[in-house]
Amino acid sequence: MMLGSLTRCRTAVPSQMFIRAATRFNSTTSSNVQLIESLNDFKKTVVDKSNEKLKMVDFYATWCGPCKAISPMVEKWADEYKESADFYKIDVDQAPEVAGFCGVSAMPTFLFVKDGKIVSKVVGANPKNIKRDLDLFTK
């Protein structure tokens, strides 16, 4: 369900447009981002060492404003880096055991995993640092 509407933004000031756009959050993901719903799934896909690709995990909550704002960028990166990285999303309210297992206490949190080990962690909607880590660990 879409909470915001861009049709009303035509006369809004830019800051209002950002707030309204951020309220649009679709929990579905592109075909290049997989949802993880359990600790067992997390261990099978992210911790698995057989795949040498970088794995980026986005821990989010549906009520989290910064999570909503950065979600379109995550989708874009998933398309851009699809050959060199796998992308996952975890709703911390639906899979709290995964958040606990990873020590995640703030949203959004982005974990970068390579060869079954966490190589970097970005807390907050910080596109510059996320992009930096994607570039660094996909080379």
Regions found by a protein language model. Give the residues of each.
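N-terminal mitochondrial targeting presequence
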Residues: 1-32
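A short beta-strand-turn-helix
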Residues: 35-54, 96
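Thiol-based oxidoreductase modules, predominantly thioredoxin-like and allied folds used
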Residues: 36, 59, 70-97, 104
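Amphipathic alpha-helical interaction motifs in eukaryotic regulatory proteins
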Residues: 43, 47, 75-82, 88, ...
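Short pre-active-site segment immediately N-terminal to redox-active cysteine/selenocysteine motifs
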Residues: 53, 60-63, 106
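Structural cue for short, hydrophobic secondary-structure segments
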Residues: 58-60, 112
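The canonical Cys-X-X-Cys-His
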Residues: 64-67, 110
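Non-catalytic, surface beta->alpha helical segment in thiol-disulfide oxidoreductase systems
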Residues: 105-106, 111-139
